């Protein structure tokens, strides 16, 4: 029995569809498996070389789905020249996470800063609850702009999604500009 789509794949994705009647818990991957399925769908008669290339595929689906939204929230009139340079690099990035590129580091540091700010309530309450995963966080940011937990509780202002995108972007650029001299190589000099 061959599947209708012409291939089988497994990459820690959800093991059932939405018709499964019983509860189960687990942390299932939401990006790599979709990337693998996408590549397999567009390949026609995949060769061993195609499969080797797929194993080394480093396209960031998280970045592809999330970065355009994050960038759309940046108020570039408030940025300094260094921040504008990083913003431009992020706008032109193809979502490939090659080790010799700086842009993936910018994105993942920005994402890390954004997670800290978005889910600050979890850290402040010393709760044992886990923060929502990247997939859920990305969905909330893109689809629930007034979600209560987006607000930074330690400030008097009620922050918006746009605010936390801008704050976390500036935190990221500050991080890279303040790396100790000995930690910088020539590529990290601004």
Regions found by a protein language model. Give the residues of each.
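Structured mid-domain segments that build the active-site/substrate or prosthetic-cofactor binding neighborhood
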Residues: 1-85
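Acidic, low-complexity N-terminal propeptides/linkers enriched in Ser/Thr/Asp/Gly that mediate export
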Residues: 13, 52-190
């Amino acid at each position: 029995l061959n599947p209708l789509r012409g291939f089988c794949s497994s990459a820690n994705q959800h093991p059932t569809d939405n018709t499964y009647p019983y509860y189960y818990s687990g942390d299932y991957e939401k990006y790599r498996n979709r990337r693998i399925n996408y590549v397999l769908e567009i390949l026609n008669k995949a060769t061993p070389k195609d499969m080797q290339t797929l194993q080394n595929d480093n396209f960031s689906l998280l970045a592809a789905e999330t970065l355009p939204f994050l960038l759309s929230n940046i108020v570039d009139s408030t940025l300094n020249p260094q921040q504008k340079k990083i913003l431009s690099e992020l706008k032109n990035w193809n979502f490939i996470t090659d080790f010799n590129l700086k842009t993936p580091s910018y994105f993942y540091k920005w994402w890390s800063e954004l997670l800290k700010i978005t889910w600050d309530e979890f850290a402040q309450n010393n709760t044992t609850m886990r923060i929502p995963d990247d997939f859920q966080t990305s969905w909330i940011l893109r689809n629930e702009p007034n979600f209560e937990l987006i607000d930074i509780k330690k400030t008097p202002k009620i922050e918006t999604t746009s605010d936390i995108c801008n704050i976390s972007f500036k935190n990221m650029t500050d991080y890279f500009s303040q790396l100790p001299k000995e930690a910088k190589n020539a590529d990290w000099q601004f």
